[in-house]
């Protein structure tokens, strides 16, 4: 039986009354966002809106993005990536559990020096996935060209974010490439491995 989204008590500033709000709303008040599922358009729109709101409220404070995601849609992930680059607030990315595929890309997209992982986290990079079903050959060719274009763009961005050569990124992402938190640090996808919130 699923437990659902937990609720926690929250007192609005200046109020004597407590209200029960879902845990994600309460964390959002503290500028803590959570990517804990596959990346899709709905998740991306929600995270983009929250980052834009928090940035407009106070761009001098960091936004904390916790990531435990198997990855997902490239286009949805790029909307989150572009927003991380767009906002004035520093975006601290924290891997808890797994950051795979687009999840790893977003982990590496955080503010340099502020990309961290917990000790037992796993990070996985690979080339973008594309699938075709019974379609015309010309449509398959168009889709293949677009996937190759996206692959090059993602690999160039990973190269910039990690400091690894484009050629190394291309080779490593040809298949699933798993890294421990320490290995991800050595690779340049994150800056530190942490075990306490004050270290982020």
Swiss-Prot record:
CDD domains registered for this protein in UniProt: S14_ClpP_2
Reaction it catalyzes: Hydrolysis of proteins to small peptides in the presence of ATP and magnesium. alpha-casein is the usual test substrate. In the absence of ATP, only oligopeptides shorter than five residues are hydrolyzed (such as succinyl-Leu-Tyr-|-NHMec, and Leu-Tyr-Leu-|-Tyr-Trp, in which cleavage of the -Tyr-|-Leu- and -Tyr-|-Trp bonds also occurs)
Active site: residue positions: 101 (nucleophile), 126
UniProt enzyme class: hydrolase
Biological process according to GO: protein quality control for misfolded or incompletely synthesized proteins
Cell location: Cytoplasm
Pfam families: CLP_protease
InterPro entries attached to this UniProt entry: ClpP, ClpP/crotonase-like_dom_sf, ClpP/TepA, ClpP_His_AS, ClpP_Ser_AS
Record GO terms (molecular function): ATP-dependent peptidase activity; ATPase binding; serine-type endopeptidase activity
EC number: 3.4.21.92
Family that this chain belongs to: Belongs to the peptidase S14 family.
Subunit structure: Fourteen ClpP subunits assemble into 2 heptameric rings which stack back to back to give a disk-like structure with a central cavity, resembling the structure of eukaryotic proteasomes.
NCBIfam families in UniProt: PRK00277.1, PRK12553.1
Biological role: Cleaves peptides in various proteins in a process that requires ATP hydrolysis. Has a chymotrypsin-like activity. Plays a major role in the degradation of misfolded proteins.
Listed name of the protein: ATP-dependent Clp protease proteolytic subunit 3
Species, as recorded: Synechococcus sp. (strain CC9605)
């Amino acid at each position: 039986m699923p437990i659902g989204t937990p609720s926690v008590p929250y007192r609005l500033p200046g109020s004597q009354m407590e209200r029960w709000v879902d845990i994600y709303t309460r964390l959002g008040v503290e500028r803590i966002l959570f990517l804990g599922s596959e990346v899709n358009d709905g998740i991306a729109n929600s995270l983009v809106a929250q980052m834009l709101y928090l940035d407009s409220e106070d761009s001098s404070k960091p936004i904390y993005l916790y990531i435990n995601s198997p990855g997902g849609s490239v286009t949805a992930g790029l909307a989150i990536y572009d927003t991380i680059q767009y906002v004035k607030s520093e975006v601290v990315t924290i891997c808890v559990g797994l950051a795979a595929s687009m999840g790893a890309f977003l982990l590496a997209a955080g503010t340099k020096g502020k990309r961290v992982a917990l000790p037992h986290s796993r990070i996985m990079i690979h080339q973008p996935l594309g699938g075709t079903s019974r379609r015309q050959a010309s449509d398959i060719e168009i889709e293949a060209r677009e996937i190759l274009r996206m692959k090059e763009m993602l690999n160039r961005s990973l190269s910039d974010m990690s400091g690894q050569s484009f050629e190394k990124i291309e080779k490593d992402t040809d298949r699933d490439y798993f890294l421990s938190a320490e290995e991800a640090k050595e690779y340049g996808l994150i800056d530190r491995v942490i075990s306490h919130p004050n270290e982020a």
